[in-house]
Amino acid sequence: MSIDTIVAIATPPGRGGVGIVRISGPNAYAIALCLNGNKALQPRLATFCSLYKGNNEVLDQGLVLYFKGPHSFTGEDVIEIQAHGSPVVLDLLIKESIAAGARLARPGEFSERAFLNDKIDLIQAEAIADLIQASSDTAARMALKSLQGDFSKKINQLNEELIYLRMYVEAAIDFPEEEIDFLNDGNVSQLLQRIIGRLEEIRSQANQGVLLREGLSLVIAGRPNAGKSTLINNLAGRDVAIVTEIAGTTRDIMREHILLDDIPLHIIDTAGLRDSDDLVEKEGIKRAWQELKRADCVLLVVDINNPDQQNSLLNELRLTLPNKIPIITVYNKIDTTKLTAKCDEHTVYLSAKTGEGLDELKKVIKQVVGYQPTEGQFLARRRHLQALDEAKALLLTGQSQLTNHKAGELLAEDLRLAHQTLCEITGEFTSDDLLGKIFSSFCIGK
């Protein structure tokens, strides 16, 4: 690990009442003395100081806080300077700190040092960035839960059960002369099944956290004049798409971002799907299919007065799109009929024009993508889901080895690999490439 002393501005760019410069590393205290004219600092106390340039010219006044390692965020000596929030003043403080022996921090390097010094685990480090970037109050609360260790505790408890099972299995392999066949006495099978069930429960909770963090890509598709643009306008609560009676009005991709019960919803309106000789419209249709293949969920909007549109297009979507992408059929323009709004598992009847049935649509979207907020919810990332899925696959393989082949050695190896995979979530076992990828996405100064 680097023993450089690092410095960065910890507050957002721009002018403000207060700006914070953060310094961390073995020379942090000495650099602070260079900046404040050798005024002694007491740990965990704020000291009002004049702040000087190298020629002893005062450049500002502010508070200087000293956190002596290891009792600091990074585990190192940390200095935080609270100066006036002028970009010029803050830049001068950075330059003076570098002149005194610091270097500019990389994005996320303060959090990386906290992780490497065992102040936080990898889940908590990611939660810092997620809390900063939270798009709703629920997402912020869930990120805080992850930062406080809720998600980490679940993974650590799962690992403890897995370690116990590994010890049990490996003892049975190492002492085959024992009268009791530990591998086949039922305990191993029961313990393994319990761990798989617990993993599935955590995976379900993590999936809710991913939805809250990353949101949902919702693509609106249909024939021309089915009411797609009217629907996106109604969902957005404002006019974001041009609506006319002329078929083919929407030719390019239209994007809008809203919150659906705290889920970030990335709505994409597309050109009407049909055969066309118009070069511009053909390009719009091509882009529509590209967006459909990347969607998390598709709304197929059908003019209820032309229900035959639905069958051919729905079949085409099912043949073209991956099976994992759910399709909700939206029968629009019920205001032109005697029908009222209603819904079932994958079908909604509504009027995009009047808004009748919009609540039913939102309900179906949440059901289809599996959003079920729970008390123990926490924020998570896709890499966590991938690791949980990989660990489950290994455990199921091990279960098969035990049940079908009585292969204790193969089961032990699958348990070891599953344990290693779960340790990657918290960072107990990880690679430099993964750390670089995670921390490089952080703000400088965090």
Swiss-Prot record:
Keywords on record: Cytoplasm, GTP-binding, Hydrolase, Magnesium, Metal-binding, Nucleotide-binding, Potassium, tRNA processing
Homology family: Belongs to the TRAFAC class TrmE-Era-EngA-EngB-Septin-like GTPase superfamily. TrmE GTPase family.
Residues noted as binding K(+) in the record, renumbered to the chain: N225, T244, I246, T249
Domain (TrmE-type G): residue spans on this chain: 215-370
GO biological process: tRNA methylation; tRNA wobble uridine modification
Gene that this sequence comes from: mnmE
InterPro entries: G_TrmE (IPR031168), GTP-bd (IPR006073), GTP-bd_TrmE_N (IPR018948), GTPase_MnmE (IPR004520), MnmE_dom2 (IPR027368), MnmE_helical (IPR025867), P-loop_NTPase (IPR027417), Small_GTP-bd (IPR005225)
Physiological role: Exhibits a very high intrinsic GTPase hydrolysis rate. Involved in the addition of a carboxymethylaminomethyl (cmnm) group at the wobble position (U34) of certain tRNAs, forming tRNA-cmnm(5)s(2)U34.
Subcellular location: Cytoplasm
Binding site for GTP: 225-230, 244-250, 269-272
Cofactor descriptive note: Binds 1 potassium ion per subunit.
Subunit structure: Homodimer. Heterotetramer of two MnmE and two MnmG subunits.
Residues where Mg(2+) binds: S229, T250
EC number assigned by the record: 3.6.-.-
A GO term from the CC aspect: cytosol
Protein's name in the database: tRNA modification GTPase MnmE
High-level lineage: Bacteria, Pseudomonadati, Pseudomonadota, Gammaproteobacteria, Legionellales
Cofactor: K(+)
Residues involved in (6S)-5-formyl-5,6,7,8-tetrahydrofolate binding: R22, E80, K119, K446
GO MF assignments: GTP binding; GTPase activity; metal ion binding
